[in-house]
Structure formats: structure tokens, C-alpha cells
Amino acid sequence: MKTLIRKFSRTAITVVLVILAFIAIFNAWVYYTESPWTRDARFSADVVAIAPDVSGLITQVNVHDNQLVKKGQVLFTIDQPRYQKALEEAQADVAYYQVLAQEKRQEAGRRNRLGVQAMSREEIDQANNVLQTVLHQLAKAQATRDLAKLDLERTVIRAPADGWVTNLNVYTGEFITRGSTAVALVKQNSFYVLAYMEETKLEGVRPGYRAEITPLGSNKVLKGTVDSVAAGVTNASSTSDDKGMATIDSNLEWVRLAQRVPVRIRLDNQQENIWPAGTTATVVVTGKQDRDESQDSFFRKMAHRLREFG
């Protein structure tokens, strides 16, 4: 009888342990698969594509690739002598038309004072018309001078903000055209994370929720806050024909891949450029508050580790 009881007890204990283990593993698996997290996340930053507003030879490059620069710092200079001469020519035109306008103003004033008693109305009108023409030419010359001055100022390319010069593509002696991108500037203190969450996990993502960011290849966990969720994404299976009618591609009904939606996460602390824009990370949205690691069970900790490997 005692032997039977011991066998039954061992069997019952084994069954209970198996059930408990199954429940624990099942909960860990559900937490791993359904909680709001993704390994498809990228560090991003505000990037300014710097292009000159004038064309010409590059006469001086003042920075090197990946250098941290301050707002207003000179990056490179374009052919100033040419634009200086253009400004001097425009200034000479302004001076000429100013003198000519003064002469025509005096002539028109003299004829208007003499009146029709001394000359015909046609001669008076002609003097007034010549004056107006010269004044218009003076205004045009002044506008040309102002543009020449602006072009000269813009031969010096300056940093529009504090940040890092990257992908520097200009060298002294090269000819650069107006509007062609010469360098990119990654703004300092503008880093954030874009986490591409599956649509099935968006229920647990809200603006203001806390998030943990683990850069790929690092054990350091950064903290952040969900800033916003994208309002829409492109439907790759839907296009329009030449009449504007929707064209929907056929999908396999038994295979439905979850669409990924960008979620923008604001970092609590800027990390400078330790993790450059474009590098990857794992993101876990923990809810309204940060996760208390001391309260995590063994299986939950295992689920967190699983996220790093798939």
C-alpha cells in the first residue's frame, strides 16, 4: 500500500511540475511573442544636406570628415574673386545710373518749370519719360548689386547648426555646381530611435509609454519615451491604374504577414554619436512606467534575453 502511495505521489508531483513548467514556458513564450517589442529598430537623427547656392571652384576646405562643428563655422569656400568682381561691376552700374538719374531729374525739373510757354508739351513729356526710364534702370542695377552681394556672401559655406560633418565629398580645386549636395551634417542632440513595430503589437504602444533601447552588440540599456506612432504606411499590394482605379494584388489568405509601423522614440539622454544614425537596436515598450528588473521572474528574464537572439 505504501509503495503504491509513493508511486502515485511521485507521479502526481511529476505531472504537477510538468504542468507548472509548461505554464511558465507558455507564459514566457506569449510574453516574448505578443508584448510590444522589436529588433527592427534604428537610431536616427536630423540630417541637413548642405549644398552651395553658387557655382565655382572650391578654393578652401576648412573641415575634415566626421568633424564636430559649431553653428556658423566655415566648412568650405568657393571662388570669391570672381564674385567680388561681379559685385564691383554691379556697384559701378549703380553709381552710373545714380549720376544719370540726377541729371535727368534736373532736366525734367527745368522743363516742367519753364512750361509750355517755352517749349512744347511733347518735349516736357519726353523729359519726364526719360527720367522714369533711368529710375527703372537704377532700380534694376540696385537689385543686381544686391544679388551680387548675396552671391559673394554665399561663397562661404557655413554650418547651419551644431553637428557632425559626414560623407564630406569636396576637395580644393574641384568645381561644384549650385544645388549639388557637398556634405551632410548630422545635427547634435537630435538623435532618436525609429522602432518598426508589428501591427499586432501596437495595442501596447501609446505616446508617453516608456521604452528600453538596447543597441546591437551592446549590453547597455538606454531609456526613452514613445513620442509618436506613424499615422499611415504604404500599402505595397495596392496601386492605381492609368484611370486612377485601385489595383489590388492577390494575397495568400493563409499567410498574412504583419505590417510594420514606425514608432518614434525620444531618448532620455542624448548619446552624442556613440551609436551613429542608421545603426540597429532592440526596443521594448514597458508601458506607463520603466520595468523593475528586480521584479522579473526567471522566465521573463529569459524572454528578454531571447529578444537579443531572435
From Swiss-Prot:
It is a single-pass membrane protein. This is p-hydroxybenzoic acid efflux pump subunit AaeA. Its main location: membrane. Pfam families: CusB_dom_1, HlyD_D23. Keywords: Cell inner membrane, Cell membrane, Membrane, Transmembrane, Transmembrane helix, Transport. Induction: Positively coregulated with aaeB and aaeX by AaeR. Gene3D superfamilies: 2.40.30.170, 2.40.50.100. One of its GO terms (cellular component) is plasma membrane. It is found in: Cell inner membrane. GO terms for molecular function: transmembrane transporter activity. The chain crosses the membrane at residues 12-32. InterPro entries: CusB-like_dom_1 (IPR043602), CusB_D23 (IPR032317), MFP_Efflux_Pump (IPR050393), PHBA_efflux_pump_AaeA (IPR022871), RND_pump_MFP (IPR006143). Belongs to the membrane fusion protein (MFP) (TC 8.A.1) family.
